[in-house]
Amino acid sequence: MGCMLAVSALGVTACGSDTKSSSGGTVSGDNLTIYSSLPLQGTSKGQSEAVISGEKLALEQAGNKVGKFSIKYVSLDDSTAQNPGTADETQTAQNARKAVQDKSTIAYLGEFNSGGTKVSLPILNKAGIPQISPSNTYVGLTTNKPGSEPGEPTKYYPAKTRTYARVVPADDIQGAALATTMKEDGCKSVHIFNDKTTYGAGLARNVELAAKKVGVTVEGNDGTDKNSANYRSLAAKVKADCFVGSGVTGENYVQVFKDVAAANPAAKLYGPDGVAEAAFTDPKKKGIPANVGAKTKVTVATLGLEEFKKRGNADAQKFFTDYKAKYGTGDPDPYAIYGYETMKLALDTLKAVGDKANDRKAVAAQMVGKTKGRNSVLGTYDIDNNGDTTLTDYGLYTIKNGKLTFSKVIKAQGG
C-alpha cells in the first residue's frame, strides 16, 4: 500500500545527496543486521506492529541465524509525533542513512508507505543495500506502467542496478481487482476520491483505467485534504451507484466514507488495502459506523486462512500455527503475513547465496530476478527483474462486527 509521506510527498530529488557510500559492499565478520522501518505512531501503528510481529516470528523460526551468520534485528519508526501515522520525509531519510552508516547492514525492510520508499530507496540503492517492502503498491517504484509519473522508476535507482523488491502486487493489479469487483457487483458508474498521496493518487489512476476497460463509467476522480473537518460538499457530487475511496485511514478516510455514505445512501462503497485496518473498520476504534461498514468492501493482497487451507499451503498453515503459539491469536492482522514473508524472503535470499550472505551486491542480485518458484505463506511466486512479485490474486473482504472478513478471491490482471 502505500501511501502517505509527510512534508513533501514528491520531494525526493535530493535524497541521498549527502550519503557518501558507494554501491555494493561486503559486511566484515559474521554479524549481520536487518533493519525495519515503519510508521509506529498514529493510525498506521496497528498495521506496522502487525508487520513487525510477522518479521520477528520469521527470524525466531530461523534461530536468528543464516548459516554461519548471526542476524540482528533493528526496528525504526519512520513517523514522528508531529506527523503520526505516516512516513515523515526527514525521519525516513534519517532511517535510511542510519542503515547505510551501519557497516553490518545486509537488508532493509520498508517502507510501509510508497511515498516513504520514494525517499529511502535512492539512498539505499546508492549504497547497494537490498530493500524489501511488505506493503508498497505504487507502480512507479518499479515500472513506468500507467499510474506512474515521468522519470519513474529510473530516478529511484542511482546505482543503475535493482536492489528493491515487494511482496504485494502493484496497484495496476489492485486497480483491476477493484474494477472487476465493481463490475461483478453490477456497478454502472463509479466516483473516485483519492487522498493526493503517492499511493492514493496513483491507485486512483489505476482504478480509472481498469474501470473503463470493464465498462464501468468513471464519473469523477477528486482529491481530498486530510485536514478538512468534513467532506460533505465534495460528497454531494457523488451521484454514481458505486464509490471508491482511494486512500489510507490516516488521511481522514473514515470521515470520507461516512460523508459519502450519508450523501448517497444507495451507493456501494469500496476501499483498498490502505484502509484494511481496525482503525478504519471498527467503530470501537473510531472507525466507520456499522451501517457504513455493512456496505463497504475492501481489497487486500492476502487471502483468508480457510482459502490457504483449501489450497493446501503448508507454509501458511505453519505460519498461523506458530503465530498463535507466540502471540495468542490465530486471526492476525493481514499485514502480519506480509511482514512474515518479507523477513522470510530476506533470510532465504541470504541462505541462497551461502558464504556470500554478507555481500550486499550478491544478495540483491539473487533477490531481484533470481527468486523463482518461491513457495511461501502467500503462495508460489517469482520476483521479476523489476522487483515485482508475480502474484496477482487479491482477496475481497467485507466488514462484520468491526472486522475484515474474507469473502472470495479476485482474479485480476494489471495493465
Which residues are covered by each model-predicted region?
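Sec-dependent N-terminal signal peptides
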Residues: 1-6
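C-terminal motif of bacterial Sec signal peptides marking the signal peptidase cleavage site
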Residues: 9-14
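Beta-alpha junction/loop-to-helix N-cap segments that form part of ligand/metal-binding clefts
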Residues: 22, 46-50, 65-151, 223-229, ...
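Extracytoplasmic "Venus flytrap"
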Residues: 24-56, 62, 66, 76-89, ...
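Extracytoplasmic ligand/sensor domains, especially the bilobed periplasmic-binding protein
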Residues: 105-222, 268-270, 274-291
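Extracellular/periplasmic periplasmic-binding protein-like sensory domains
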Residues: 259-339, 404-406, 410-412
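Segments of small-molecule ligand-sensing domains
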Residues: 322-337, 347-406
